[in-house]
Structures are given as structure tokens and as C-alpha cells.
Amino acid sequence: MNDPTTSSRPSRVLLVTASVGAGHLSAARAIATGLGQLSSGLHVETVDALALTPRWFRACYVGGFTLGMTRLPRIYGLGYILTDHPQRPGRARGERIRLWRERQVLKQFSRFVLDFAPDLIVHTHFLTTPTLGLMITRGKLSAGQFVVVTDNDPHRFWYAQNVAHWFLPAAISAERLTRWGVGESRITVSGMPIHPKWDRPTPREKVLADWRLPADKKIVILTGGTTFTCGPVVKLTRRILELCPNICLVVLAGQNKKLLGRLARAGSPAGRLVPISFTDRIHELVSVGSLMVTKAGGVTTAECLAAGVPMLLTSPVPGQEAGNARYLQANGAAIITQNYHRVPAEVKRLMNDEKALRQLAENARGLYRPGTATIVRAIAGSLRL
């Protein structure tokens, strides 16, 4: 690793992510925000590695992921299982072929890294870590590497050599890394990095007033993630409102204008349905929620843990999403529904069971770890700030 104490220039940290799914970029932004509060003598840059790959590769990589998650979940899950090996140190022949191919499309990215000359590289996605690790082995790069894993059950694709330290969202993840030959001294169970705003108290009365939410109803939040894989949202909305007359349903529609229009025409009584377009204040809404109906994305569920909000996880896609869901359900912070049609009835059951909601909320708070703060402290220590 470059020694920043031997130079008068600010220490340089490169946060490497990939714009496939929202969680990896959110994690990188959270760390960048935390580092921004740390020191003015620090140069931090975030790069989307996919933006520095050929257009055809970017289209296949992102498009394949989106298609699998939204249209072909079983095929996606099968591919996930077939590539999740070997569970031991070293590389299998198939892995070496895959990594060689990836190095070919990462040449522009590799040049960018060399030009930036970072003291430390922090990865929130697995694509580029092996390539940079090989550059370190060959003496072309002297920066250290940190890896921030964003799944509770990490896939073999996360494995890489020449990683100084690993940060995991949950203790359950550590067992898999040790099987890959990663020493326990290089593993920290930090929790998922989320924006520091999730750690700030939000007065309930102010949030209700600002968002014009009723104070006499439970708030249920429905979101389908960035690709809206949470089932037929409008149909779910209508059925939930039919079964649960004493709730206010907040639907996070993001930038989906078509969905916003359909929700606006849903004909719900005032105060019962609140469609929300894209906002960076979701933490306020979640803080007053009694239940979050969502997909089991790593960062999304970590935000719910920070807010202490029970989760109803809908039809987890086989793979990392299913792994996240199993972990949360096993620890009593979430309930899984494998069928969209069961979601409204499950919401009704939970709304009528205060004891179950309180227990889910308590378990969620107990699982939360302040990942951003832990990772930022480790970065500062590594750079001797």
C-alpha cells in the first residue's frame, strides 16, 4: 500500500462500485459521505466500473441481471448455484477463464486506476477486485484493497486475492470467507454501510406533518425496489387497503411515472393511500412505519434494521436475495412470503398482532450494526489519518 505519510499530497481513496442493482452504489455513497465528514485532507473519488467497460459488455451485464431478477428468477437462481464454487482456497479452471475474460473488458478501468494512483481502493462490488489483485501481484499497483460485501450470504464471485481487509454485513458471512482461505484477522463484521442519516433521530410528529400522514393509523410502506419486482403493485395496493381499513399505505414508486399515475387513479379515500415519487428522504417515512413490504435487497433491509422496522419480504429471488431473506427470518426480523397473492393477508395478520410486530421490531434493532462508521474508522486507521 502507498504510504500517505511520506507525501504531502492528500491521501487518495478510490471507491469502486458497479451500477447493477441499487445496493452497491448506495453502499459506496454511504462510505463516501462518511469519509467526507472525516478529513479535509482526503481525496475521495467514486467510480462506476461498468461505465469504463465496452458498451456491449455493460448492456449484457446489467441487462442479464435485470432480466434474471424480474423475468427469469429460477434460471437466475440456477446460474447462481452453478457458479457458486469452489468453496475452498485457490481457483478452479472455470473461474480462471471467467477472470481472464473480465480482465479483457476492464482494461480501460485498469488504466483509470493507475492514473488515479490511489492509496486505498474500497470495493462495494465484486467485478473488479480480482483484476486489481492480479495487478498488485505483478507489481503494477501498490494500493491496498478493502472489500465491502453487500450480501449476507456472499457468492463465490466475491472472492479475490490481495485483499487487505473484508467487511461483512453479518457474522454468518464470515464462515464462507474462511472456507475460501481468508484469515479471521482480515475479517470485520461491520454491518452494511448505509447513509449516516439513517442513524439520526427523526421526530415522529414532524415526519407525519411534513408528509401529511395520518397520526391515527398504522403506516405500512410498500416498495418493489428499483426494478419493481414486488409483484403487481397496484393490485396489491387495492387488496391491502380492502383487508386493512385502519392503515395508511405509503407506496414508494420511485421514478416510475406510469405506476404513480395508476396509483393516483386507484380511488382510495383520503389518508389511506399515499403514492411517493423518487425521494432522498425515505428514511423519514420508514422511521414512522409499522411494517415494510419489500424485496430482500442487502442495503434496503439494512436500512430497515437501522430504523427498527419489521419487514415482510416478498418472493425472494433465488440467490443473494433469498440468502438475505433467510438470514433475516432466522433472526426474527422479517417474515417471508413466497407468493405475492399471500401478501395482503399477511399484512392483515400482522396489523392485528401487536405482539408480533413489537417482537419483529425489537429483533430488527438488535441485528443492526453501524457499518458506515466502522468502515470509515478502518479506512482512517489504514491511512493513518
Feature names for model-found ranges:
Residues 27, 78-181, 186-189, 195:
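Active-site and donor-binding regions of nucleotide-sugar-utilizing enzymes
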Residues 30-112:
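Conserved N-terminal ligand/cofactor-binding loop architecture of enzyme catalytic domains
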Residues 164-226, 255-256:
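A nucleotide-sugar donor-handling region in carbohydrate enzymes
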Residues 204-206, 211-288:
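Donor-nucleotide binding loops and adjacent catalytic segments primarily
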Residues 287-297:
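Acidic donor-binding loop of glycosyltransferase active sites
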Residues 330-331, 339-355:
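C-terminal "capping" alpha-helix adjacent to the active site of nucleotide-linked donor transferases
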Residues 356-369:
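A short, well-ordered alpha-helix in the C-terminal region of glycosyltransferases
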Residues 367-385:
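C-terminal alpha-helical cap of glycosyltransferases
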